Design a protein with these regions (language model features):
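Short acidic, glycine-rich surface-loop motifs adjacent to enzyme active sites
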Residues: 137-153
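Structural motif
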Residues: 19-21, 111, 141-142, 237
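Conserved N-terminal subdomain of the carbohydrate kinase-like
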Residues: 59-142, 320-332
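Conserved phosphate/ATP/ADP-binding segment of small-molecule kinases
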Residues: 157-253
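Short, small-residue-enriched loops and turns at beta-alpha junctions
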Residues: 119-122, 149-153, 181-184, 201-202, ...
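Short beta-strand scaffold segments in enzyme catalytic cores
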Residues: 55, 100-104, 246-250
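Glycine-rich phosphate/adenosyl-contacting loop at the front of the ribokinase-like
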Residues: 1-67, 76-80, 332
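Conserved phosphate-binding/catalytic region of the ribokinase-like
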Residues: 4, 8, 210-332
Length: 332
């Protein structure tokens, strides 16, 4: 195992103002087969929640650093692909292979062919990743804590410790987590929590069992109550994505709705990550109020569903669409 180091720093972005640091514990190697000539097209990328978020942050022009672990053949390929995209990567070597998936989209639907598990990080690997993240966060405008695909990659309490330690350095901490990981992050205290309506439902935070016939129709008031509870548990602000029903945000005690124009759907996967990343990038770059950032995030999420690439987007299109996002206070 080598000491943690910056694998790539093409333009000195680690010292740039408005930088976003993404904690991405275990990126994936993703292989997607699309329809095309000669039997189809094969697309190979680095992926995973943190990578998709970093990709959108970069698309919106904010400097971004990815803190992550890489191991085995799949990890080496994933890291090389990130470097090829020009990312600033703080890489920790790990003994085990990185997880990977192969998805077939030739019929228009995303069908899993192979999905491998992600082994747990060793104590030493996690310690190195943790220290590297704290170091990089010192000069960052926003620190975004993402989760790995595998449940066993790292202890959920890592998020409590990270949130608390980052808060002690006055870092603006945003998390896009659910379940036990979110519970622990809240204990550490975070500035912004982003969660989906489905995750609130699965976590039992809406007062409706996820298997109940009415589970998909939890009313808005139940979501708002859950948002206030999240705030009481340690969140400064709470943002909830609701697929086609727009975004709800609890900001300074006021609930607002952000509604983007309806778009034709190509692939819904990654829309929530684009929302999260666009909010982080806007706060880092512009230092504006959270309402404006939520409008940009809603636009990024809406445009994401029109594209095949996860976490991809056009800055001009996103900012233009943001002007058409309606943000209003919710009464009651």
């Amino acid at each position: 195992m080598t000491a943690p180091g910056r694998a790539h720093s093409p333009s000195g972005d680690e010292d740039a103002p408005g930088r976003v640091v993404v904690f991405a514990p275990a990126p994936l190697l993703t292989i997607t087969i699309e329809a095309g000539r000669f039997g189809g097209e094969v697309h190979v990328h680095a992926g995973g929640q943190g990578v998709w978020q970093a990709r959108m942050v970069a698309a919106l022009g904010a400097p971004v650093t990815i803190c992550a672990t890489f191991g085995g053949e799949t990890g080496r390929v994933a890291k090389a692909l990130l470097l090829d995209e020009g990312f600033d990567v703080v890489a920790i070597d790990r003994a085990d292979h990185a997880a990977a998936y192969v998805h077939d989209r030739r019929d228009g639907e995303r069908s899993p062919v192979v999905e491998t598990d992600d082994p747990p990080l060793s104590r030493h690997e996690l310690d190195e990743l943790y220290a590297a993240t704290l170091r990089e966060a010192m000069g960052a405008a926003v620190v975004l804590l993402s989760g790995p695909a595998g449940d066993e990659v790292l202890p959920a309490d890592t998020y409590r410790r990270l949130a608390a330690d980052l808060g002690a350095f006055d870092c603006l901490v945003m998390v896009d987590l659910a379940g036990e990981r979110l519970d622990h992050a809240l204990q550490g205290g975070v500035d912004i929590v982003k969660v989906s309506h489905e995750e609130l439902l699965d976590d039992g935070r809406l007062g409706v069992d996820a298997g109940h016939a009415d589970a998909g129709r939890a009313d808005e008031s139940a979501i708002v109550e859950a948002m206030h509870r999240l705030r009481s548990e340690g969140a400064g602000a709470v943002i909830v994505s609701r697929e086609s029903e727009g975004v709800l945000a609890l900001i300074d005690g006021t609930v607002v709705r952000a509604t983007a124009p309806d778009m034709e759907v190509v692939d819904t996967k990654g829309a929530g990550d684009s929302l999260t990343a666009a909010i982080a990038a806007t706060l880092a770059r512009e230092g504006v109020d959270l309402r404006r950032a939520v409008a940009v995030g809603a636009a990024a999420g809406a445009l994401n569903v029109t594209r095949h690439g996860l976490g991809t987007g056009d800055e001009g299109a996103i900012l233009a669409l943001a002007e058409h996002v309606v943000v209003t206070d919710r009464e009651g």
